[in-house]
Every structure is written in structure tokens, then in C-alpha cells.
Amino acid sequence: MSKRNMWMGGVTAFALTLSYAGSALAADASDLGNSLTPVGAERAGNADGTIPAWNGGDMTPTAGWKKGDPRVDPYAGDQKLFSIDASNVDQYADKLSPGQIKIIKRYAGYRMDVYPTRRSCGYSQAIYDATKANTSRAKLSDRGGILDGFGGFLFPIPENGLQAIANYRTGFNGLYTHLKVSSTISQTGGGFLLNTGIIDTYAPYYELNAREIDNRYMTKFIYKATAPAASVGGIIMTLQPYNDSNESWGYIPGLRRVKKAPTANYDTPGQDDIRTFDQTYMYNGLPDRYDWKIIGKKELYVPYNASRLRTENLDISNLIQDKFPNRDLARYELHRVWIVEGTAKAGWRNTFSKRVFFMDEDTWTPLVADLYDTKDQLWRFQENHTFMAPEMPGCVSAADFYHDLNADRYVADNLIVKSADANYSAGDVVKSDMFTPDAMRRYGLR
């Protein structure tokens, strides 16, 4: 069989196993907390028994763990079920995305180790209550901006792709967080560039009286660079409005000035040149340059329960390899995902003709994304490795990986290694008044 036929065979297998999500779309708010989980996932397991029923998530921290400690893998005793690699990828093609198939076939040694499925993700009752309330109040603008709704997932029973994307844009990653993060950018010819910094985040969207506190911005970020030397002291602040494009400012230490960055949106190239601004965090910003639709729902092998990417023994040097991250550190499980496709709108500049997100039913988080170039060829591939943080409670990213399959380069982002601080309930450190240009300048002068 030719490589082209093998590739098309994988795509065909994927398409044939796709289920239309009509039954899910026919549900209503009374099903939340019953046949559906409080955020809209199917509560029941699958017929094969390979996906268990959701039983509330793993809400208890690992014995002995305390806030500020590196993570302990609560599932370290799980035995690997099997591995997917170039020798058997076609056997599993019906439960893989086209991007997963392509990266396995492209890079010798790339594999996916599959473990028993654990539906570990859960949230607070306050988020569940707000999610149910949003079923009668949530409203989007024509651009996909948020006109009403707060405190939980906006559309637990989405009627269209735009609503599904809105669920991710408003996903819970903590009210106040303080993270010491690293990212790497692989270089042509080998090696990587390392960036480190501190990210402070405030999400007024998740305040109990969110719209009274801040009716313009739903999430606010400040990043202060600590490496490399040329970047030390530089600060970037990004504010995400409910109903407008992201707004960003930069602080330049040498000038001691704060300047607004008017173009840091959509497909503006990032520092790494192999990722656009709106690829960050899998996808961010207004979704108004794509037509979005729900393709369906299916079972997919996805990264999950990635606590091993946050243990005290993890080091950049044993995670980052030439073409892809160390496969010994990645855990995959079988989960149900929503497939949401965005097709570029005519009349707008778009780097990608199409983006396909595979969104975890229990969190609305894209765990896998396939991105296509303007000739409709698969070009970039993204993965989001998440884990459950019971102290929040909620599932958050342990690492994001962004692959350019033409350039053979990748970005590893949101890494927190060794004893680096990861505080997901940082109200004692992060304050709501930090997120202004004036406060940003004062922060830079410290």
C-alpha cells in the first residue's frame, strides 16, 4: 500500500467511526446532573467498558501532598495497556485524529502509551450551579463575544460550534493563579531556546458577582520574564474582554515604559515563528474569523491525567527531545470528545484554512487540535496534557505542545518543573488591582 493510501485509509477509518451528536444536542437543562454530568458530558460509560461512568471526579489530594509541593502522580500504579506507534497505528486509526496519525508516521520513535481511563475531572458546586443558571441566561454576539453569562460553562448543551468554543474560552483554570513557568522552542539544526517567567492570572468571570465587579474583562494575565538574559524584566499583560479582541501591553525595562501592543491577536506570529498568538493555550481570543460547527462526538485516545509532567524529578533536559517530547512521560487514555471545526471566513486574513478541535467532554478543553494550511493540507498539530488539581478543584494544563509538521520544530509551553511554584488558589499573592498599565509599570520597577 502506498503512503498516500495508508494516509487516506487512516482518515477514512476516522470518518467512519464518527458519531453524530444529535442525541446530545437534543438534551435539555433537566438532564444536567442526571443522564448528563453538571457540565454536559455523558455520565454513563461506554458499551465496551473502556470508558467508565463519571462519578464526580477525583476531588481528594494525594495523601501527604500540600499546597506548593510538586505534584505526585496519583495513578503511578496503573499498568500500561498498550502502545501505538508506526508499526500498529493503522489498527487504531479509528480512535486517532489525522494529526496524531501523521505525527506517528512522520517521526521514528514517536509513540502513544495508553493507560486505563480515569474520568478524574470535577469542579465545585458553585461552578455547577452557575453552569445550570447559564442555560437560561447565556448569550453570544454575532462575533462570538459573551453578552451574558458568567461563573460556569456557558453552554453545557451546545447547539452549535460557536457555543462549544465559548465553553472553552470560559473554562475554569482558577480564580487567582501564580505560576513559575518554562517554555522551549526547538531550533533548526537541533537544540532549543528556553524561556522562563512568572504568570499571574485573575479571572473575574468566576467571581460570584462577576458582572458587577468587571463587566468588560473576563480574564487578565501578566507575564514577567526571568530568562533568557535579554528578556529579563520584560512584562506582557493581556486582558481578555467578554466581547472584543484581546488587549495587550508590554513593559520594556530599558525604557521603563509601558506600550500598548495593537496587533497581538488572531494569527499574528509569535516569538517562536511556529505558532500564532491565537494558538496559545490551544486557542484564545474572539472566534469571529472562523465559521464553527460541531462535527460530532467520538472516542479518541487523548493525553490525560498528566501529573507525571509536574513531579519533582522532572527536568527540561529529560522532557525536551529533538523532534518531540520524551514519550516515556506522556500518558494517553480513551475519552469521548466533541469534534468542533472552524473554517476560515472569506474576507479575513487567516494563516489556517481550518482548525479542528477535539474537546474533552468532561472539561470542554481541546486536548488535541489539527490545523490545516491554505491548501487544506494538515500543517500543525497541538496537544494539551491536563491533570486534576483537587485543591481548586479543576483540571488544568501540565504542558502544551505545538508542532509544525513541515518545519519539524515544536514549542513546549506551560511547563512547571522540579520545585517551581504552581499556586492555583493564589488570592494571597495575586490581587485584582495588579492588572492595569500603571500597576504593570510599578511591577517592572521592583
How would you describe each model-predicted region?
Residues S2-V11:
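Bacterial N-terminal signal peptides that target proteins for export
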Residues A29-G57, I84, S97, I222-P241, ...:
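Gly/Pro-enriched, hydrophobic low-complexity segments
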Residues A29-N246, I252:
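Solvent-exposed N-terminal domain segments of exported/luminal and surface proteins
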Residues K180-T184, L193-A229, T280-F357, L367:
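Extended beta-strand-rich segments in extracellular/periplasmic secretory proteins, especially
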Residues A420-R446:
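Long, C-terminal catalytic modules of enzymes
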